UniProtKB/Swiss-Prot annotation:
Similarity section: Belongs to the LeuD family. LeuD type 1 subfamily.
CDD domains cross-referenced by the UniProt entry: IPMI_Swivel
Biological processes, Gene Ontology terms: L-leucine biosynthetic process
Originating species: Oenococcus oeni (strain ATCC BAA-331 / PSU-1)
Catalytic activity, as annotated: (2R,3S)-3-isopropylmalate = (2S)-2-isopropylmalate
Any one GO molecular function term: 3-isopropylmalate dehydratase activity
Protein name: 3-isopropylmalate dehydratase small subunit
Amino acid sequence: MKKITTINSGVIPLMRDNIDTDQIIPKQFLKNILKSGYGRNLFYDWRYKATSKEANPDFILNKPEYKQAQILVTGENFGCGSSREHAVWALKDYGFQVVIAGSYSDIFYMNSTKNGLLAIELPKKDRTILASIPAKEKIIVDLPRQQVRYEKYQFDFSINPLWKHKFINGLDDIAITMNYAKKIEAYEKEIPNFN
């Protein structure tokens, strides 16, 4: 998992509530078992025209001034719906490192923490300020200090200390388990052989 400490990036405002996992990555694109290749179909039904499948120039991800943004600012209950891990994979594959929402579905939130997508909860008034930032401007997400900063604004957020440790050190569950490799090996040597 890639380490996340401080992200300095533009934001993509998508201030809609109840964006479900089928809107994030529709079911017809879930045929791959790898974690890559999903970004091109992120928000597919909004991003492309239904009749021609051409890019919808009115959708924010298709606007050139937002191409490099790594932070998505969105509404309440983000990632609701089915439990597909592919939704997080699609966001990561597109280039997002952080999502700032009012709330998340529990399963989406856990999938995010396990796949290196920092999911931050902020109240609507704070997100409204962040969503109004011009495309060329950048904000700072400072995980060690648990702050989102932009000019005179500073928004504090909460995160489970274990997840914070995992993000800052780039540790997934397997890497954390491997920290105990010597203890695991010692335990395995003590197990009687039943052959």
